[in-house]
A protein has these predicted regions:
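Small-residue (G/A/S/T)-rich helix-start motifs and N-terminal tracts that mark the onset
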Residues: 2-151, 155
């Protein structure tokens, strides 16, 4: 709670209602840098970017290109071989300069992009625009791939 409590005035500790039942029978897990290694497959020397996993990111509303760039970089750093970013058209040039190795698309290409991907992440900087809501609904309703949603997607 520190250093935030130094700036908060009087602090009250309260039960916010998150108990064991909140996790749907699953215990929360924490991974450290060292413990993650055992969960990752070894990379074969004959592999290439297409064999190391394809991540689809639905990220970055107009003016929020930075969130999409950070998410794409994180996907590469954690092992994705290929990353495709579905983002607002206004962000395309910024993203291509910030992370040129990534692929780009629009919400119109979302269905084919979901088929292409091995895993999908939705939310970094998508905001509350109508197009963001349409993309989010499409992913949640139609995709059967592993899905990560951040706070923007949940809002």
């Amino acid at each position: 709670m520190y250093p935030g409590t130094d700036y908060a005035g009087q602090v009250h500790i309260a039960n916010v209602g998150i108990g064991p039942e909140s996790f749907l029978g699953q215990s929360p897990e924490m991974y450290t840098y060292d413990s993650c290694e055992q969960h990752l497959p070894d990379r074969t020397s004959s592999g290439n970017k297409g064999t190391f996993g394809k991540a689809l990111l639905v990220a970055g509303s107009n003016g929020m290109a930075g969130a999409a760039i950070l998410a794409a970089r994180a996907a590469y750093r954690t092992g994705a071989g290929m990353v495709k970013v579905i983002t607002a058209e206004e962000n395309r040039q910024i993203l291509q300069q910030g992370i040129p190795e990534a692929l780009y698309g629009s919400c119109r290409q979302l269905s084919e992009s979901m088929e292409w991907a091995d895993v999908i992440a939705v939310g970094p900087g998508i905001g509350r625009e109508e197009q963001a809501l349409e993309c989010l609904k499409k992913v949640v309703e139609k995709s059967r791939k592993p899905l990560v949603m951040d706070a923007d997607a949940l809002n």
